[in-house]
Amino acid sequence: MNASSEDPSAGFKWPVSVERPIAAPAIEVWNAISRPGNLELCHPFCERNPVIAWPGPESRDEVHYLSGWMYERRFRQWIDGTGYDLEIGRKNGSTSFVSWRITPIDTRACTLRITVCPHALQDIPVAIRWIPYTLRLRPLLRDYLESVVKGFEWYVVRGEAVPRNAFGTHPWFSGR
């Protein structure tokens, strides 16, 4: 997929979003999310975040989770000061669409929203899909996103790296 005007989330059903207010100017949150290797400082389940290409819509990096999983992020849209869209997944595997957006509240605060359109369950008929989505996928993905957004808040507000598993462990991404 290219970085054109195509909607990379087209075809995905039932996205999961988390939004959190952060007591910092939008530019400070942008500086955190747009910094190369930012996940090492801000992500409570990230062990390493090596950068392949940065910055802009052709950015690529890897997320090495505490659990041993490794995902590749391929950025598709880069909106200076506002956010970006990307695809994430195992190398040469299926990808999920992810959108990061910062919205100013006033000069001293903003919100950070992360929306994931997960690739998991997309090929299962809707009549069946809603059961694992409602009981397992959505709650675990929401917990994960809450921890990630809290991690960025921690880093921006405190000026220090977020501790690993700072907001609790996660069955997919924490160390085993």
Spans of model-derived segments:
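Hydrophobic ligand-binding cavity/cleft-lining segments
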Residues: M1-W54, W172-R176
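Short, surface-exposed coil-to-beta transition loops
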Residues: P15-S17, W69-R73, S94-S99
